Amino acid sequence: MNEYYQSPLSQRYASKEMQALFSNDKKFTTWRRLWIALAESEKELGLDITEEQIEELKAHALDINYDVAKAREKEVRHDVMSHVYAYGVQCPKAKGIIHLGATSCYVGDNTDLIIMHEALELVQKKICLLYTSPSPRD
């Protein structure tokens, strides 16, 4: 359900690879990768963040608890904060450092850029395959 982006157009015209790039799973695991990178950088800069907290974040980077995030979003009406909360439920030791000092744009905009970059790489790969494959007239 969350593995692939779903719309009538994507189901008809997009490859499974492209649908996976724009899926909820990709979006929210990228948010978590960005929060891990943020925590690692802040630790390196001297903030009071432990390796144990970072390891806890890494341990739950891929198992998105969609049900908790969805329930929280109904309360707070904010997608990023609902996922911060949901990640904190899974990572109680690291709860206080998730999204520390960041804005919603940190995860939203950077995730969009990462996904667009990967999508363009996929398009480039497919164009190169077309360009290098023999012509039907040959």
Indicate residue ranges for each PLM-predicted region.
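A helix-coil-helix interface module used to build multimeric assemblies
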Residues: M1-P134
